[in-house]
Amino acid sequence: MKLVYLVLGAVALLLLGGPDSVLSSSSGNLHTFVGCAVREFTFMAKKPGCRGLRITTDACWGRCETWEKPILEPPYIEAYHRVCTYNETRQVTVKLPNCAPGVDPFYTYPMAVRCDCGACSTATTECETI
């Protein structure tokens, strides 16, 4: 019964404030948020022979459930690692300013449409291990 009230409360919050109110920029929500969401991101697009251009786009952001536990048989550990990764993207092309003659002024980058927690894929995500 308590789960029903929790779900109804979340739906009411979404209806009253929209999805941005749930994942707002207030530090409290961002520090406790577990999951993967599309969020605004700003970076400097650069290319040799052109001036840089500050771009604001959508990117994937979040924390996903991950755990490891020891087991008695090799490899002696069971691991479950998920990362916030791109599920769907759209390619966006912009024209960089003041490019030198002969330099292609166009710069293409991915914009996140949908993000999910999943296994890290080097095709869409920079996967690093320590």
From Swiss-Prot:
Cellular component aspect of the GO annotation: extracellular region
S-S pairs: 36-84, 50-99, 60-115, 64-117, 120-127
InterPro entries assigned to the protein according to its UniProt record, in alphabetical order: Cystine-knot_cytokine, Glyco_hormone_CN, Gonadotropin_bsu
Alphabetical GO biological process terms: adenylate cyclase-activating G protein-coupled receptor signaling pathway; regulation of thyroid hormone receptor signaling pathway
Keywords for the protein's UniProt record, in alphabetical order: Disulfide bond, Glycoprotein, Hormone, Secreted, Signal
Molecular function as annotated in GO: hormone activity; protein heterodimerization activity; thyrotropin-releasing hormone receptor binding
PTM comment, free text: N-glycosylated.
Signal sequence coordinates: 1-24
Compartmental location: Secreted
Known glycosylation sites: 87
Keyword Glycoprotein attributed: yes
Xref: Pfam families: Cys_knot
SMART domains reported in the protein's UniProt record: GHB
Tissue: Expressed in the anterior lobe of pituitary.
SUPFAM superfamilies tied to this protein: Cystine-knot cytokines
Family as reported in the entry's similarity comment: Belongs to the glycoprotein hormones subunit beta family.
Additional observations: Overexpression of Gphb5 results in proptosis, elevated serum T4 levels and significantly reduced body weight.
PANTHER family registered for this protein in UniProt: GLYCOPROTEIN HORMONE BETA CHAIN, GLYCOPROTEIN HORMONE BETA-5
Subunit comment: Heterodimer with GPHA2; this heterodimer interacts with thyroid-stimulating hormone receptor (TSHR), and hence stimulates cAMP production.
Function: Functions as a heterodimeric glycoprotein hormone with GPHA2 able to bind and activate the thyroid-stimulating hormone receptor (TSHR), leading to increased cAMP production. Plays a central role in controlling thyroid cell metabolism.
UniProt protein name: Glycoprotein hormone beta-5
Organism of origin: Mus musculus (Mouse)
Lineage: Eukaryota, Metazoa, Chordata, Craniata, Vertebrata
